[in-house]
Amino acid sequence: ATIDEKTGVYNNKFFRTISEMELEKAKRGESLSLLILDIDNFKKLNDSYGHLIGDKMLKRLGIVMKENTRKYDIVSRFGGEEFIILLPKTNIKRALIVCERLRRKVQQDNEMIKYKVTISGGLTTYQKNDSVKRMQIRADKALYQAKKLGKNRIEIL
């Protein structure tokens, strides 16, 4: 199985396989960016409205992400309320545009607006001799910065 049942996006196992293939292309000079994002205050959302609403928001986020990324972008669940998106053929400038659009779409989504759902993201791009793991570590640090700086934002590292 390649799809995460709760969210409708790719699962982590599929992401690991496909990301290694995309990394090889990046090593040959193609642009590659990576975004880790999560739902802000997800625990509070679950505590306030219950897990059914939390699950519904995860599913809705999956839909919004798929609708607002290109067909060759790899949208996957990273775990919990965290998602990871691989953006092939995308430099950091273009990736930031994609990420900001996604952040705004979530904030304005009719189903999510009732629960004040927002997302924060950490963005990075391939650097010489990178591994997927190194890219994930940088994106995760950038996500932590976005949370620390007030949430509902994208940070780059």
What is the role of each PLM region?
Residues 46, 50, 54, 79-82:
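Conserved phosphate-binding and hydrolysis motifs of nucleotide-dependent enzymes
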Residues 16, 20-23, 136, 140-144:
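Short, conserved alpha-helix that lines the donor NDP-sugar binding/gating region
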Residues 47, 51, 88-92, 111, ...:
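Short, conserved catalytic or interaction motifs in soluble domains
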Residues 1-17, 37-51, 59:
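Conserved nucleotide-binding and Mg2+-coordinating catalytic segments in signaling enzymes
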Residues 22, 106-109, 146:
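Signal-transduction coiled-coil helices of two-component systems
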Residues 18-49, 65, 76:
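Active-site-proximal structural segments of metal-dependent nucleotidyl cyclase/transferase enzymes
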Residues 138-157:
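Catalytic/regulatory signature loops of cyclic-dinucleotide turnover enzymes
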Residues 60-134, 155-156:
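GGDEF/GGEEF active-site signature
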